[in-house]
UniProtKB/Swiss-Prot annotation:
One family name in Pfam for this protein: Orthopox_A5L
Protein family membership: Belongs to the orthopoxvirus OPG130 family.
Disordered: annotated span: 1-33, 149-186
Record's protein name: 39kDa core protein OPG130
Keywords, ordered alphabetically: Host membrane, Membrane, Virion
Subcellular location: Virion; Host endoplasmic reticulum-Golgi intermediate compartment membrane
Biased composition (Basic and acidic residues): 24-33
């Protein structure tokens, strides 16, 4: 019996693993708590994943239902336009069979057009002198030329620069019917010459004088300057400098006089104030 019991015990230990129901081990409470939390998180995660999938499916269905339907494209019918057929020009026949040309709908037809129809309907055997009517310049062309010349004279471009003569185009009609236009040449204005001379004052300041000269009105004076010798030119410059110096001295004197007048006026005002104070006391 002892041998049988030992054999049965050894067989049970060798064939039964520790993970079987015969082997039990007490788990740590923290381990059990962690396992419970992990199981809860997994179930919660699967729940939210399922909710997300359902929401995405609903959104896709709503988007598909909201897609606008493509409207039917209108049918465009293109009707070809009839091509106008050119009418051949009539051929002049002898007077016996020549058809009488009738003018079209009466519009503003001038006397020249009536002369032209009369000439076409005349006999081809007539002399050349009778075929050519007396041609006069058209009133319409004359009116256009007159209006053009009038507009050329009346047009003045707005500008803030000094007035200058602009080239005016004049058109005339020749005896042969041609129109010729002429434009005179206008010399552009030269820019004005500006010179500034600064002179030091005895008090340490500087007085500057600016002079401006426009060479266009006196083109002859510019030519005279070009023809002057160097000696005459230097003497003229010295004369101008002396004149400018005299004007500068006058300006300085006027400044001194103004200062003296101001000082005396202030003294008079102070004396009046003191006298008024004494009168009040």
């Amino acid at each position: 019996m002892d041998f049988f019991n030992k054999f049965s015990q050894g067989l049970a230990e060798s064939s039964t693993p520790k993970s079987s129901i015969y082997y039990s081990e007490e788990k740590d409470p923290d381990t059990k708590k962690d396992e419970a939390i992990e199981i809860g998180l997994k179930s919660q995660e699967s729940y939210y994943q399922r909710q997300l999938r359902e929401q995405l499916a609903r959104d896709n269905m709503m988007t598909a239902s909201r897609q606008p339907t493509q409207p039917l494209q209108p049918t465009i019918h293109i009707t070809p336009q009839p091509v106008p057929t050119p009418t051949p020009a009539p051929i002049l026949l002898p007077s016996s069979t020549a058809p009488v040309l009738k003018p079209r709908q009466q519009t503003n037809t001038s006397s020249d057009m009536s002369n032209l129809f009369d000439w076409l309907s005349t006999d081809t055997d007539a002399p050349a002198s009778t075929l050519l009517p007396a041609l006069t310049p058209s009133n319409t062309v004359q009116d256009i030329i007159s209006k053009f010349n009038k507009d050329q004279k009346m047009t003045t471009p707005p500008s803030t620069q000094p007035s200058q003569t602009l080239p005016t185009t004049t058109c005339t009609q020749q005896s042969d019917g041609s129109i010729s236009c002429t434009t005179p040449t206008v010399t552009p204005l030269q820019p004005p010459i500006v010179a500034t001379v600064c002179t030091p004052t005895p008090t340490g300041g500087t007085v500057c004088t600016t002079a401006q000269q426009n060479p266009n009105p006196g083109a002859a004076s510019q030519q005279n300057l070009d023809d002057m010798t160097l000696k005459d030119l230097m003497s003229s410059v010295e004369k101008d400098m002396r004149q400018l110096q005299a004007e500068t001295n006058d300006l300085v004197t006027n400044v001194y006089d103004a200062r003296e007048y101001t000082r005396r006026a202030i003294d008079q005002i102070l004396q009046l104030v003191k006298g008024f104070e004494r009168f009040q006391k």
